[in-house]
Swiss-Prot record:
Zn(2+) binds at residues 210-211, 214, 226. GO terms for cellular component: extrinsic component of mitochondrial inner membrane. Component of a multi-subunit COQ enzyme complex, composed of at least COQ3, COQ4, COQ5, COQ6, COQ7 and COQ9. Interacts with COQ3. This is Ubiquinone biosynthesis protein COQ4, mitochondrial.
Amino acid sequence: MLRLSLLRSTATLPVKCQRRGLILPAAAMYTLGSLIFGKEARLADAMERGELHNKNVDYAKEAEERTELRIRALANTRPMEPRYNGHVPLHRYEKLLLFAISGWNSFFHPEDGYNIVQLGEATALPVFLENLKQTMLSDSSGRRILKEQPNITTEILHMDKLAKLPHNTFGYVYYQWLKRENVSPDTRAPVKFIDDPMHAYISKRYRQCHDFYHAITNMPIIIEGEITIKALEGANLGVPMAILGGILAPLRLKKVQRKRLYNIYLPWAVRTGLSCKPLINVYWEEMLEKDVTALRKELKITLPPDLRTMRKERAALRKEIDAKYNSQKRATTPA
């Protein structure tokens, strides 16, 4: 009996050892998992209750102070303190870099308005802006604009009212032009790199009035239209960037576009710019209910040939010529 019992015990020993070998690692894994995941669960609960943070510390205030320190550190690298909201003072070498980079980008990517804006500020020399200020000070409307410093926005212009004006008014013409070109007066970028606050406002006013020049001359915002209006601004106001644009921008156009500009639109822009009233002195917001034809006559602005119509006529002519060519080609090609 004793021998039989020993044999049975010996036979079952490997099975028990095997079970123990499985149970011990499983228990170890369970214990380790409980420690890890239990700790994470307790950590999450503590975070939710706010027990992890020092309740005596104002974290929002600390973040604000860190931001203020970074701003001060950056301000210490500037040549002067900001002189108006959004002003970014630049060193001379930074202004030269801005001119070089924005000029390069404007030439190769004129469709990007941000490049044009930067080039405009880089070339807006104080002597030019001071001359423009004197032009405004010499005129009663210009003086009022400088004193009141109006800001042109859709809210100020009341676009819903412009849509209901008589069709012969400048306001309705302007409203229709905005709709046709799918633009808004609210999209004008703020001035940042001009140091003198008054000069900055004059630059802002010039920028915001740009669409009025387009509307009163019925000029679209395609590249040819933009070059034409820039040439008008250059002749009328002496804007350096506008003069550069009128000279250099046509070089990248197609031959037919350059021909249109050189033969029709640039001569018109220069003549009109030199003969019409300084457009920077026009209080456009007060002209919206005026008859557009009378306003053009008052400002001595004559309309150029419709650029949209000329482009459509040329496209139709080219389509007709292509159709005739293809028809003749098919007729002469053997079956």
